Amino acid sequence: MKKISLLLASLCALFLVACSNQKQADGKLNIVTTFYPVYEFTKQVAGDTANVELLIGAGTEPHEYEPSAKAVAKIQDADTFVYENENMETWVPKLLDTLDKKKVKTIKATGDMLLLPGGEEEEGDHDHGEEGHHHEFDPHVWLSPVRAIKLVEHIRDSLSADYPDKKETFEKNAAAYIEKLQALDKAYAEGLSQAKQKSFVTQHAAFNYLALDYGLKQVAISGLSPDAEPSAARLAELTEYVKKNKIAYIYFEENASQALANTLSKEAGVKTDVLNPLESLTEEDTKAGENYISVMEKNLKALKQTTDQEGPAIEPEKAEDTKTVQNGYFEDAAVKDRTLSDYAGNWQSVYPFLEDGTFDQVFDYKAKLTGKMTQAEYKAYYTKGYHTDVTKINITDNTMEFVQGGQSKKYTYKYVGKKILTYKKGNRGVRFLFEATDADAGQFKYVQFSDHNVAPVKAEHFHIFFGGTSQEALFEEMDNWPTYYPDNLSGQEIAQEMLAH
């Protein structure tokens, strides 16, 4: 047995040496990528400097993929491993824990890009109990051309940093490809800017970023599969929904079966078309010369079949409940007293992250999602709201320590009650009131917390109001609400948390 083990080890060693020698022989980098868009973007940047390999081919669902031992070995033998985001390739964090980072360089294509909150991607017939894919954050950024450019730029910059001797080639290749992506972005912007119908209905909820960046609204629909007809009950629901919203097209991630297309056309009066999520290309697609840009051009053409037709805004089948406690809608009876222990911990002000631009992506998202203010206007609004010179607050069950101008001031506090405030929008908030027992507390004598909760619970972040006059005087402050998050979070992590909520 020992001889066999030694023989196998020797053969493995010889194999690895052979692979290493092969890499040295052609002088090219060995880059392993996860799924199609990552492969395509990396290949375009690396060009002839690398052998770029695709790990997850057509026919394999990237959301559900788990790497085999062979695939892991392939990654471990690479010079560079490129993936999109851990919310897409959920297996990557475990892999990275075992990877020899001195040998294999790793690139996360999304880099510091913030992601929108995820959700359930409904696929399959819900009458059969099939479930979609859940993402904590939505990873489908490659389906927006303007964000695809950012992915390419990050791959370019990462490869250039890792292999500076090839930087000029990477930059030249990336520039040529980005020019094509900019033309694609322009085609989308011009093609959709005058959309008569801004809502589109899709069976695969992967197009949120595309919709957001080009002024559209994705409406996801559940209980449909491209290769199976819905039940009679589901078909009746769809028929009512389609007619009520005057829906002309329902988009699938692949061609719907002729039987399904005929059924939907006959019973619901709606046509089907394809919006390709570009998670893979088939061998036939590749042979036909298809690529990211050509498929995205087809997606635009398909979308315009909806956007070029007049119609009312299409509402989701199930309306989202926005009147939650977190948004300021609650009964008085739900409001309970709280103690300082709810806020115990070490906290940092978010104001420095606003100043250094870390939150700029958050303001861009808010501007596009709400349409109420521009990115610059949101930044100005939050600059006033977050402004403070208290950089840190450390809280125990009965004390608060304020770090201001590099100096620490610590006082003991008692709980003195709560106050429900009604805002101009009609929603409400609760402030929980504390008062220092120290005579020299000065501007920190009176303190109020607001954290979007109305009953005892451990705060994840909070807004704080403090002053030396009275609690009543603090009730009048509505424009400045210094905000604090745990001090072990990075600015990037805080920004992502803000988007999540």
Swiss-Prot record:
Example of a GO biological process term: cell adhesion
Biased segments, Basic and acidic residues type: 125-136
Main location, first listed in the record: membrane
Places the protein is found: Cell membrane
Lipid-conjugated positions (N-palmitoyl cysteine): 19
Any one GO cellular component localisation term in the record: plasma membrane
Protein origin, superkingdom: Bacteria
Alphabetized PROSITE patterns for the sequence: PROKAR_LIPOPROTEIN
Pfam families: ZinT (PF09223), ZnuA (PF01297)
Molecular functions (GO terms): zinc ion binding
Span list, region Disordered: 116-136
Lipidation (S-diacylglycerol cysteine): 19
InterPro entries linked to this entry: AdhesinB, Bact_metal-bind_prot9, Calycin, Lipoprotein_PsaA-like, ZinT_dom, ZnuA-like
UniProt function note: Part of the ATP-binding cassette (ABC) transport system AdcABC involved in zinc import. Binds zinc with high affinity and specificity and delivers it to the membrane permease for translocation into the cytoplasm.
Family assignment from sequence similarity: Belongs to the bacterial solute-binding protein 9 family.
Notes concerning its domains: The His-rich loop facilitates the closure of the zinc binding site and is required for zinc acquisition.
The protein, known as: Zinc-binding lipoprotein AdcA
